[in-house]
Curated annotation (Swiss-Prot):
The keyword Transmembrane helix is assigned to this record: yes
Organism: Schizosaccharomyces pombe (strain 972 / ATCC 24843) (Fission yeast)
Skewed-composition ranges (Low complexity): 724-733
Protein name: Probable Na(+)/H(+) antiporter C3A11.09
Phosphoserine: residues carrying this PTM: 446, 735
Transmembrane segments: 12-32, 36-56, 105-125, 133-153, 172-192, 206-226, 244-264, 295-315, 319-339, 361-381, 415-435
Residues annotated with Phosphothreonine modification: 442, 448
Function: Sodium export from cell, takes up external protons in exchange for internal sodium ions.
Bilayer disposition of the protein: Multi-pass membrane protein
């Protein structure tokens, strides 16, 4: 008999194991999460397996009594807190502004995954009926918000996920845990109720209308009332800071308790209450710096997954007398993890506005983990099939093979547990394998030769996936000053003695990339040391070593993500501000596609739109032109207009868009060109103000140009570049004229060169 002072009890041993593991995990949590990219669920499950009843035999929850009931209630507490936090962390009015994405992800995608999982279970487990396969498949339809925390939380990898995709996965994982109840009860009612028409009636009236619809309304009412009450208390000074921070946790417990008491879906009540509670993002902004929700979630997740690792039914994974073997479960897990969500998300990608391209669709389809929600739904299903209640009976009650649906009750728990274990391994380590493969593939040896490498020390370290700010023109001054100050710190100061001056002048060495060519200022001038004084290095604030803080300093507002060929700009809440595709930006225009014979651009709609654009451009050019001028004899201006109209649209806009003239300028230009032919007595070699004459090969003025007959000599004009008029103004008598007088008497003429138009 051992000494009474060191007697070990089961609860105290459980406290020591869970507390010891949690302490060790927190001491090295940064390395595990940020370096190894492993979540807390994976490490906690492995700890439970080691200390559980099949290895160390120190932590044995199966000896505590009714294990199913304990597991169900622990899972209920964790889920109501997690789904409430998921709803509270969403941006302002997210469910209303993104209802289309949520509708597609919660109904078509879930139904597709439910039916696909049913087919695999019905094919691989031979003794299961189709309705029983529907019931088991409904347990794994929902995604888990706990396992999805690695991509929807605040970790290092989650910051690389675009905000719109992260918010969509967060809202889906919080809402579909409660949405799995209708799928489950449809299969259960079809199994236990005869005839089938009663099953449909009860399913619509009890499950859809009362439990789900009324549960959502009740949760929204609770959230709105709680939001108004906490605002009132905070304004009147009735709450302290500690109570304010923990208010969301106790409100989640209240939603779970009141939902269970009145018989509605408590998970939907909690999620809707969280979304309504933080509908205006007021509470999220108030608690943004405290991180109290993350602390509570971490404690609950670590404790529960240690418990999950200890209750895994390892002997039941291989039961030959039940036609259940390990290879069937392995094949089933592979098929379900691949085909449950990925094909559905790729299929409905065009109907989800928050999914931009196939890369995001593949990412969203892969991260649909199976976790705590599957265990909770499985225990509810077993209780309904056993005793037609949500409270499970002790395990001894299901040992009788004479009860209905005995085989389904026996194989349901090991099948769901194996799928949960597979999801923990795959989704918990997929980020680690992704980052490892990415790092291996990007190893390269590069060599760059520069004249001076001092400027490289001032460049920020850019990591793949990190958003980069686009600096405005005003920020160029500070950039130049920072480069100059860094060069001053690394080079010695040269002191040159001035013989005429009493003091010495200090000259600083120039930057290597600014030594030959002077740096241009934003206004077109040069940077001057007196105009832009360098800032003192000692007065600068020291850089923070935390990478996240440095990234926040670089990107205080909008964030930019390059996803494949798509450039997405988001605000701080994950809303898409702009979406640009490189294919659209760099691709050929409509006119180029029509010229190249693109079959997609030859459709009637594209041709008609191109025709309307050309017609509108022609109408705008001829809008102010008088009718009498259109009937005149073709002159140089009309020939230029005809050439301009026959040019492609994209070349007109890019080359001569700044030379458009109005009707007054056109009349002045034609009047001056007409006077050229009338002044035969004047010297033709004297250039007139504002007029650029054309010259032929013999350097003589062309008579065809004076008469306005250029249509026969267009090909000859293309081979000659027109010479420019001299800069100095010359009068008709050959004497120079002052610049001011020349500017006053010079006509406002914009002469379009034919050779430039044809180029």
């Amino acid at each position: 008999m051992a000494w009474s002072q060191v007697e070990i009890s089961k609860p105290h041993l459980a406290y020591a194991i869970i507390g010891g593991f949690t302490s060790l995990f927190m001491l090295c949590s940064l390395i595990i999460k940020e370096k190894l990219f492993l979540g807390e669920a994976t490490m906690a499950t492995a700890t439970g397996l080691i200390f559980g009843p099949y290895v160390a035999k120190l932590f044995v929850p199966t000896s505590w009594g009714n294990t199913d009931y304990i597991t169900e209630e622990l899972a209920r507490v964790l889920l109501v807190v997690e789904v409430f936090a998921a709803g509270a962390e969403l941006p302002r009015a997210y469910m209303l502004r993104h209802w289309r994405s949520m509708f597609v992800m919660l109904l078509p995608v879930m139904i597709f995954g439910w039916l696909v999982s049913t087919g695999f279970m019905y094919a691989l487990i031979p003794r299961l009926s189709f309705l029983e396969s529907l019931a088991i498949a409904a347990c794994i339809t929902a995604t888990d918000p706990v396992l999805a925390s690695s991509i929807v939380g605040k970790g290092k990898f989650a910051r690389r996920v675009p905000g719109h995709l992260r918010n969509m996965l967060l809202a889906e994982s919080g809402c579909n845990d409660g949405m799995a109840i209708p799928f489950l009860y449809l299969a259960i009612y079809l199994i236990i109720e005869k005839p089938a028409r009663h099953a449909g009636r009860d399913w619509v009236c009890i499950i859809i209308l009362y439990e789900c619809t009324f549960g959502c309304v009740l949760g929204a009412i609770i959230g709105v009332i709680a939001r108004k009450m906490i605002k009132f208390s905070e304004r009147r000074g009735l709450m302290d800071r500690e109570s304010f921070l923990v208010f969301y946790f106790v409100l989640a417990l209240f939603c779970g308790g009141i939902g269970t008491i009145i018989g509605v879906d408590d998970l939907l009540v909690s999620f809707c209450a969280g979304a309504a509670f933080s509908w205006d993002s007021w509470f999220s902004k108030k608690t943004e710096e405290s991180h109290v929700s993350n602390v509570i979630d971490l404690l609950l997740n670590l404790s529960f997954f240690v418990y999950v690792g200890a209750i895994m039914p390892w002997p039941q994974f291989h039961m030959p007398h039940m036609d259940l073997s390990v290879w069937r479960l392995v094949v089933l897990a592979i098929c379900i993890l691949i085909a449950r969500r990925i094909p559905a998300v790729l299929l409905f990608k065009s109907f989800v506005p928050d999914i931009i391209n196939w890369r995001e669709a593949l990412f969203a389809g892969h991260f649909g983990p199976i976790g705590v929600g599957a265990l909770y739904t499985c225990l509810v299903a077993r209780a309904e099939l056993e005793v037609h209640s949500t409270v499970p009976e002790p395990n001894d009650a299901i040992e009788n093979p004479e009860i209905p649906n005995w085989y389904c009750i026996q194989v349901m728990w090991p099948v769901v547990c194996f799928l949960v274990l597979s999801s923990i391994i795959v989704h918990g380590s997929s980020i680690a394998f992704f980052m490892l493969g990415k790092r291996i593939n990007t190893l390269a040896l590069s060599f760059t030769r520069t004249r001076d490498s001092h400027f490289a020390f001032n460049l920020p370290r850019v990591r793949q996936g990190q958003s980069l700010p686009i600096k405005r023109v005003d920020a160029l001054r500070s950039s130049a000053n920072s480069i100059a100050s860094s060069i001053r710190r690394r080079h010695p100061v040269n002191i040159q003695e001035d013989e005429d001056a009493d003091i010495s002048t200090v000259s600083l060495p120039e930057a290597a990339h600014l030594r030959e060519e002077r740096a241009e200022s934003p206004r077109g001038g040069h940077y001057d040391a007196e105009e832009f004084p360098s800032e003192d290095y000692e007065s600068r604030q020291p850089r923070r070593s935390n990478e996240e803080d440095r990234e926040e300093e670089m990107n205080p507002g909008d964030e930019t993500y390059l996803i494949g060929e798509d450039l997405v700009v988001e605000d701080s809440q994950g809303n898409i501000i702009s979406h640009t595709s490189s294919r659209d930006a760099n691709g050929p225009s409509i006119d180029e596609k029509l010229a190249q014979g693109d079959p997609k651009a030859k459709s009637f709609g594209r041709k008609f739109r191109s025709f309307l654009r050309r017609s509108y451009d022609t109408f705008q050019r001829n809008l102010h032109e008088p009718d009498d001028e259109r009937q005149r004899e073709p002159t140089l201006g009309h020939i230029e207009s005809s050439i301009e109209n026959h040019r492609p649209r994209y070349s007109r806009q890019n080359s001569e868009s700044h030379l458009r003239e109005n009707s007054v300028e056109r009349r002045r230009r034609e009047q001056v060109l007409t006077n050229i032919g009338d002044s035969e007595s004047e010297d033709d070699n004297i250039p007139r103000p504002g007029i650029v004459p054309f010259y032929n090969e013999n350097n003589e003025s062309s008579s065809d140009t004076r008469n306005g007959l250029l249509s026969d000599n267009v090909s000859e004009s293309r081979s000659r570049r027109p010479s420019r008029a001299p800069s100095a103004a010359v009068s008709s008598e050959g004497s120079p004229v002052e610049e001011d007088n020349e500017a006053q008497h010079r006509p406002n003429i914009r002469f379009l060169e034919l050779t430039r138009a044809w180029e």
